[in-house]
């Protein structure tokens, strides 16, 4: 990713090396938070003096703070207004404190950007909008809600959007991402796709990357993307529902050998609660209208899956700050350190929106 030399020079003037300056620029611009592992991967270095020197510089100049979630692991936050102002990013909200849900999402987004640093990434929602409208000629009124209650098309900071100039296509490919940092089902992902369908349909070509630490939902996400955005796969899904109904009703004589094989493969393909919900609606002739191929679809796109290792080594399986809930000897529970906010579990709806 190209970075202006004057901005790197400003960071070097604080005493940071070239590699440290590039890393800190990416963190400040796209995340605000980072871990030692991310820096070491970026610097292609082993744990030791390299990361120790970086952290010492950050602390000595008041550019960062650290929050410990497990005994030997920290998340570092670039919060210094002076550092952000120095690179012309004083307006970014990354320097502010955030809840844990936001932090985990930003760390995964940074994982993606560091792994694909050859791409160019937009730093603000305004920059994303300008590229779509001014360069790709997307009608600007597409970002307004429609009379039918369609939500605003959003370009959230937590989902990196970039441009790949290494594409085999004649024109650069715009890249959208969805960072699934919570794994509470695909309900939020489906809402995100529905909200942005009009935008995707207006593009000549685009790539979409589903970033996740859990592989169990990735194939299901690919099927959902094909149905809602690419307008394909509905015929197979409806055929599966029809055969499943006959099988469940013990009408085995109505199934050919090929149909039994298709049904068996469909059971492996259509897993997950969302397909159970769609089957429930199909039996009542209430399938969502946006599954129809004549809707806002664009088959001229590429869907990709990316599995990142995540940050369980930092947060553990239960996210809380190290020391939360400890009792001070001789004190009451009321005097113990306050408990940290926890992730609120979301429930996947049993019915899709009709």
Locations of regions flagged by a protein language model:
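Basic, Lys/Arg-rich alpha-helical nucleic-acid-recognition elements, primarily the DNA-binding modules
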Residues: 1-87
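Exposed, interaction-prone assembly regions rather than primary DNA-binding/catalytic cores
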Residues: 97-188
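C-terminal regulatory/effector modules of DNA-binding transcriptional regulators
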Residues: 170-354
């Amino acid at each position: 990713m190209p970075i202006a030399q004057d901005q790197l020079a400003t960071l070097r003037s604080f005493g940071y090396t070239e590699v440290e300056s590039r890393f800190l620029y990416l963190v400040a611009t796209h995340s605000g938070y980072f871990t030692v592992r991310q820096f070491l991967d970026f610097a292609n270095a082993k744990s030791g003096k390299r990361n120790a020197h970086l952290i010492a510089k950050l602390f000595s100049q008041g550019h960062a703070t650290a929050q410990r979630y497990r005994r030997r692991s920290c998340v570092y936050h670039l919060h210094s207004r002076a550092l952000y102002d120095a690179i012309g990013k004083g307006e970014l909200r990354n320097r502010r404190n955030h809840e844990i849900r936001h932090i985990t999402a930003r760390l995964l987004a940074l994982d993606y950007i560091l792994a694909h640093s050859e791409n160019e990434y937009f730093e603000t929602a305004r920059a994303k909008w300008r590229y779509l409208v001014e360069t790709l000629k997307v009608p600007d009124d597409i970002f307004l809600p429609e009379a039918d209650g369609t939500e605003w098309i959003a370009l959230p900071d937590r989902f990196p959007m970039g441009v790949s100039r290494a594409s085999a296509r004649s024109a650069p490919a715009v890249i959208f991402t969805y960072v699934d940092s919570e794994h509470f089902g695909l309900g939020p992902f489906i809402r995100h796709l529905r909200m942005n369908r009009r935008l995707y349909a207006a593009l000549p070509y685009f790539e979409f990357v589903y970033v996740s630490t859990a592989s169990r939902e990735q194939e299901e996400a690919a099927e959902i993307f094909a149905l809602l955005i690419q307008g394909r796969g509905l015929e197979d899904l409806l055929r599966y529902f029809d055969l499943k109904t006959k099988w469940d009703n013990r009408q085995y004589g109505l199934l050919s050998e090929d149909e039994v094989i298709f049904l068996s493969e469909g059971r492996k393909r259509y897993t997950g609660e969302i397909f159970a919900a769609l089957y429930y609606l199909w039996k009542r002739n209430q399938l969502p209208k946006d599954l129809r191929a004549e809707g806002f679809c664009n088959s001229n796109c590429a869907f990709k899956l990316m599995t990142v290792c995540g940050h369980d080594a930092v947060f553990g399986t239960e996210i809380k700050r190290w020391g939360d809930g400890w009792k001070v000897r001789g004190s009451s529970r009321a005097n113990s350190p306050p408990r940290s906010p926890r992730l609120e579990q979301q429930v996947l709806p049993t019915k899709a929106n009709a």
